[in-house]
């Protein structure tokens, strides 16, 4: 489904100190942007910010970058973080948002700059000719490896079984070791889960959520 263009979105996100307008200029300088040397974690396809806003609140000593394609999505993610700040009465200085096509992500982050990646409920691109657009495809995993630190984890969640099983092969082919896997996350022994907006919706529909942790060897 295409998002209707919201002309007010761009001015609003540009007015936020949590928006990185020229991310390519920050390549190799993200710790300077955050004014600390803490680890930096990415959420690829952050949507409206329900997931990353919880991470930012829980982990003061980790920096987060949320990436999505559209201003019309990022604007709501920024609002979500502001709501969370008002709720806990604390400013979050450890979060930035970027609007970009993830295919060009290696132009934004430098070698060993990122310590963890989250990929939640990305587009499954079921047609074979579109498979290379999947955020877990070997083509993109190769790009992520250009800026991931050694021994880095990628956490991946989806409701799409075909994507999940294909992704297991993508990770293995790309030099990652799958350290944890479940086809029913909410009935598993994994205790660190933070639910996304989609996940909560799917849970009410009785759908099973699949999850894996893959570590870069």
From Swiss-Prot:
Residues 129-134 are annotated as: Interaction with RNA. Pathway: tRNA modification; N(7)-methylguanine-tRNA biosynthesis. It is an enzyme of class 2 (transferase). PROSITE patterns: SAM_MT_TRMB. Keywords: Methyltransferase, S-adenosyl-L-methionine, Transferase, tRNA processing. Belongs to the class I-like SAM-binding methyltransferase superfamily. TrmB family. Catalyzes the formation of N(7)-methylguanine at position 46 (m7G46) in tRNA. This is tRNA (guanine-N(7)-)-methyltransferase.
